[in-house]
């Protein structure tokens, strides 16, 4: 029987915690419409900035709450922010990005959108011009946009 060394167990725990915090950041970004309204316009770096903000927030809270200090969430969010910055830079250079605005879907580099779908494979409706994500809370949905050359998938608030 092969026994995992203590160092490997720590690496596995760190990787699992990092993965959980990364997914948490993804959902916090997409499920908090005021943050999404502001940060989605940062050319694809919204998740990165969101992770940085949560890192600062948890750093302030950890100095006052012992339980949070033991979890080290501020450090995990900081690592997730650095990972997202590198990943997003490469992804933007290769693939571009897509997000939802109050006037509809936006893709970069600009291309004609031929199809918009929600996570349940239904056709995504047009966004009412007077609606912002801040009017609806905690409703992230997975979208797929089909353009002339690419297919974009992303998580965003659902306010249709």
From Swiss-Prot:
Its main location: virion. GO terms for cellular component: viral capsid. It is found in: Virion. Keywords: Capsid protein, Virion. This is Coat protein TP3.
């Amino acid at each position: 029987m092969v026994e995992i060394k203590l160092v490997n167990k720590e690496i596995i725990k760190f990787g699992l915690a990092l993965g959980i915090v990364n997914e948490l950041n993804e959902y916090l970004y997409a499920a908090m419409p005021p943050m999404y309204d502001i940060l989605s316009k940062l050319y694809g770096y919204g998740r990165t900035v969101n992770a940085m903000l949560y890192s600062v927030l948890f750093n302030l809270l950890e100095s006052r709450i012992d339980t949070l200090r033991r979890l080290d969430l501020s450090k995990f969010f900081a690592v997730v922010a650095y990972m997202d910055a590198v990943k997003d830079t490469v992804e933007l250079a290769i693939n571009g990005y897509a997000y939802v605005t109050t006037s509809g879907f936006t893709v970069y580099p600009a291309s004609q959108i031929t199809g918009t779908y929600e996570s349940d494979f239904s056709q995504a409706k047009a966004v009412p011009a007077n609606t912002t994500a801040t009017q609806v809370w905690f409703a992230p949905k997975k979208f797929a946009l089909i353009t002339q050359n690419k297919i974009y998938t992303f998580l965003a608030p659902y306010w249709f």
